[in-house]
């Protein structure tokens, strides 16, 4: 193929997006066609030269040249279609554009192949370039400045259109600009600060002056709808301050709201504080603290206590005679044991009652006499 790329001058690889381009320009246009807003504006006012060496230096100028040579989305292939079909679609689009123009000559040079879609893309690219340049130049608040720069021409056109006899005074245009700037500041302040009572009521003194200047010139939607009474400026120095009864009512209302909030915020009952309802005098008198109460409660759950004396008595494993069915633990705690024979004889001499000694259980291995037949 003897064709050259219409964008950078490199040997063309084929007919892509409605023009003979190389592979690099084809892929660049396919990536950036639907993402124009992400491209930064040209820092040299759109005077960059696009050729084979420096075609990657400025994306904005490269995309602008792609649109100028006739590249568009309608020229892209849907599936695997032949170059003949794409050239046929491009010719039909050019004929439709020339027919809508009423036979008028479309520009000279390469401008004859530019479609309406390309012109629309050029307009979008120019707008994005202006926004990016304004954002690049401004370092303090780029969002508000760029929005002001893009929307101020619309306000000027609207102001000129609403003027009497097609002519608008400079004071009216200046007032419209000031009003728009004030609205932008208010919107940014409301979006950046939380919605609190009285947070958005405070303003700058220059905004008060703008309000007084615009009072008789610009009719806001709220003023057009409400026709009963004029809107009073409460921040004016001649306006009387808030009266004392109103301040007392506001303070009382504030206290009531605080009490309601506290009553709803406190828990009704807490399982971790069983003695919270007791007065501090009883707590200081010896009521167990929370950790002690928890340990005691766990011990009672694991080892329940009963008042039955039969369960409190330990199990006796010793041998006892049939004549003494009582347990040795039922006697006095000072009863003699087998390990102290002297004390046992002394106790038997003093007492008139005979105490039978219990024989302990013998667990030794002793051969007993077995009855053999």
Curated annotation (Swiss-Prot):
May play a critical role in development of the progeny of eagle-positive neuroblasts. Residues 126-149, 179-251, 323-343 are annotated as: Disordered. Disruption phenotype: EG cells fail to acquire the neural fate or underwent an extremely delayed differentiation, while EW neurons produced neurites in abnormal directions. Residues 2-78 bind DNA. GO terms for molecular function: estrogen response element binding; nuclear receptor activity; zinc ion binding. This is Protein embryonic gonad. It is found in: Nucleus. SMART domains: ZnF_C4 (SM00399). During embryonic stages 10 and 11, expression was observed in four neuroblasts, NB2-4, NB3-3, NB6-4 and NB7-3. Except for NB6-4, expression reaches a maximum at the very beginning of expression or in the period of neuroblast delamination. Weak expression is also observed in a few putative progeny of NB7-3 during late embryonic stage 11 and 12. All eagle expression in abdominal segments disappears by stage 13. Belongs to the nuclear hormone receptor family. NR0 subfamily. It comes from Drosophila melanogaster (Fruit fly). One of its GO terms (biological process) is regulation of transcription by RNA polymerase II.
